[in-house]
């Protein structure tokens, strides 16, 4: 008896469920399923009254031709060999289907559990089956499979679905073994595998196929690449050979189908519309670069290409790209998420950089944009590792978030700029230089919501020979007034002292702004605010070990004598000897000269 070893003999319930059929199950509720059974010879019809949990059972009842599933059954786990000759299943409940096979129905999603042991001359119709369970075809000799169009992809096929069946043991034909439209095995020794997909024929791969062992895979529909079990990797080389009409993004989508760890190194396309040269796909006239193979590291784009298409290099492992003078347009997301990209040399005639064109290129540290550039799209360099960018005269527009979340600290804008959009610069920017003030520069730099502590920064805005400091965040209720005051300062050459510090969103930023405005411009309102908050500022500076900054604050003479005594103890505790010396000097000297500095 194939009982569970954890079940003692006294826990076994033996029951004759119908004449000639005896089942054995545990009397423990959680183990109440049938783990063994005996069926007398000659019985052709068996009613399953309880859950049947007999995957490990080696018995076989070849006389049984029909199963009747009772209304209380929710789980049946058996091998085909238990009832090899069953040809009809009658279900009395909604969990299982009535039909030629054992099919589990989960809210309309149908999983093939068993086809039983079909002969070589029998046809298996998968009909409206949605998925195939492990060992569903074990012991089956039939190679005649039809239907199954509802089986959408490899995720619907368990790894051992076809194990120990004729479908798995059949000889390779053209390097593959098929079960209807499902490819169940591939000859890994073949130099290339040509998949028999076409305009009207969808192919699904079994989930156990290891694509990393395939040297070269040829497909004929773009959608076929999505059938690859990416968890098992990708073939080294993939060829899209098709006469179908395709969008350029379809080609790029095939070339760049990947995971974070695995990808198709070499891609080629054979098509009436596209051609491939040295691992890069172009339109047939060669004027648009459509898709680069993900394995290429250094690319010199040939002269004659006018456009770098959408997603042409997206997610590629390219390290350097040289763009020829013939290129005038870099399209949306053309280089997005190229995490290895370090160098881009732009041609002299690039006019536009599309939205998200270089987004998330984290290793791209510096770019020099040519004088031909007229527009930089939304988020074009978003989350790029840029530390410096050179913008040339002739640039007209910088899009939304174009340089957001970069590492750029200083940027010079040309006089030709006519359109600066929302949040186009990173919070890391400390200084922006522009020949003359434009109101929209504030839109590009100042945000109207509460900042994170790490983003609560001050920026120096240099317009011609005048400058002031602006907070990167203002309250929504005062942001318009603050921007008007910034504009008024630059519009009136006679106005020498700005008062922008009060518009800062947080108290911390107000303190920093007031500090700068008092030291650089002698603002009396800033001075009054500093006197009230000097002790708080000094303690904050000391908490973050900014000794030099604390010294500069002390030297303004705005820290009270009582506060200085408290700071002296703190300086002693923190081991700040230079600060300690200045505090002692200030305590003994009422004259404390001001000193220029920057935060």
Predicted segments with their positions:
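Boundary/linker segments of alpha-helical solenoid repeat arrays
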Residues: 561-568, 594-596
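Charge-dense, extended regions
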Residues: 578-599
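Structural signature of tandem-repeat unit edges
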Residues: 1-77, 81-133, 138-158, 163-180, ...
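Conserved hydrophobic site in ankyrin repeats
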Residues: 552-553, 583
